[in-house]
Amino acid sequence: VCPCPTGNVVLQTESLPFAEIPQQSKLFVEYQLDPLALKRFYPSAVASHTQIAARIPEVLAHHHADRDLLCDALEEMNRKSGASDKTLENIKLLRESNTVAVVTGQQAGLFTGPLYTIYKALSAVRLTECLRGRGFNAVPVFWIATEDHDFEEVSKTAILERAGELAEVKNEPKRCYENLPVGYVKLDDSIKQTIDELFGELPATEFTGELRTLIEETWQSQTYYGDAFARLVSKLFGAYGLIILCPLDDRLKRLAAPVYVEAIKKSEEIVNALRARSDELQAEGYHAQVLIGEDYFPLFWQAKDHTRNALKRSENGTFKTKDNAREFTLDELAEIAENEPSRFSPSVVLRSVVQDYLLPTVCYFGGAAEIAYFAQSGEVYRILNRPQTTILHRQSFTVVEPKHARTLEKYGLELKDLFTGLENLHPQIVEKYLNNETARLFTEAEQKINVELNRLDQNLSTIEPTLADNLATRRRKILYHIGALRHKFHRAEISRDEVTRRRLETMFAALLPHKHLQERTLNVTNFLDRYGLYFIDWIYEAIDLDDKGHRIIYL
């Protein structure tokens, strides 16, 4: 039994299997249903989070990074981010040789990015508390993906504005150029305008002032993007003792140098194994998350100006940066990695190995895509003689506010009904709740037409069989036109009933924005503005690590 602490807040929740949610990968759905059946791709898979503790001896035996150097770096970066006493206590605990880490991570999104960032952090905290409740030393760590150079992806976030419609908030510093890691992007005065836009869209509540102060204190001009993200995360999760980690730190790069060197020397073996694993996955009917070409290399080159360039194997056996500005032999790359490890950053399939070399990682909480590419990166662990970390899916939520719960109830809907799309729900809503009299007349008309056409069909069949065939064609056309008219009736009724139309549109914007799960689109400021920082605690209390489905929380 997992002795997870329970709180005083009890929220109504429901669980929806991922198999019932559109656009989920086959590999992810099957992993959620039965991870042990996929042991060939996930050798450290467990049936339940309660089995994670059994991995602790193996994790500790394979962790050789200098804990004091690691924790010195972590202490400095967390103090810089305004760490709580509990976080600093956890860093002190991590110095002890029998302490393991429960890790998660995400890109440094604007104002924390999508909601699932919050859910990842709280998932790690919850499992940490489970392990501690069983007498194990464990700490939660959040790996900020500051090495990632896709700034476009993290520079914007979505909220619900005062009328309940979706609005995008974006920040674009003037000095942000292609291939620059997010951690080296510096905020300028444009962040003030972005904050003004955010609070111009959010409704004014009793919590708005507190939230604005929090955002303004953490997202400041002349602050690096990753640092701003770290400050806000530290504030939101300080009470939970979450440790933040920025991999751009030179001290961490030096600690990771042995992994870089070994990955470089074994790069050809890694690429061959990854390509073979991709073929194996595809042969089993799964999708390979990361495409691995023959020229693939597991590390990026970081230039003096900090820009990040992919390295590619050339036909003559050397390695060139994607822009062809630099060319190296394998021995040269290995020597540079040993002496100047800050010139490198790991690719997606190597990143987790670096993470688990630096940290005594007992478990990683990831999303569906991360679970998918772990099936590939497992080969990198094997080649580098590392035990593959157990990966669990982060907790997944849709938060339903009272007004949207009332709309669902009023029209007899569940969250999964929304996946068909708003327009496809119009017939059900119109005919059952708005105008069942006209709907009845349409049904009766179709029935009467079919009765009379059936009589005519019987008569024509005795005269000339081909006439009956002709009638069947015309019947389909008649019923098609009646159906088209009925569809226009549905649209007209919805348009005429403005209250219903607005209720449905705002519900879809809140629960399925841009036809995606809420957690993939909306930013946490929406809920912090309405409910204050209590919202973080409510989500934490709603976490159930035994539930591997998508959970619906009714506030």
State each model region's role.
Residues 288-362, 368-379, 394, 401, ...:
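A translation/RNA-centric and nucleic-acid-associated enzymatic feature enriched
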Residues 154-159, 163-167, 399-431:
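A structural-propensity feature for long, helix-poor, extended segments
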Residues 97-132, 366:
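N-terminal catalytic cores of NTP/NDP-binding nucleotidyl/phosphoryl-transfer enzymes
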Residues 158-187:
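A glycine-rich helix N-cap at a beta->alpha junction
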Residues 114-115, 128-150, 389:
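Glycine-rich phosphate/pyrophosphate-binding loops
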Residues 22-87, 297, 481-486, 504:
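Low-complexity, highly charged intrinsically disordered N-terminal segments
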Residues 114-116, 150-157, 255-260, 376:
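Short acidic, glycine/serine/threonine-rich loops at helix termini
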Residues 4, 11, 232-328, 424, ...:
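Long, compositionally biased intrinsically disordered regions
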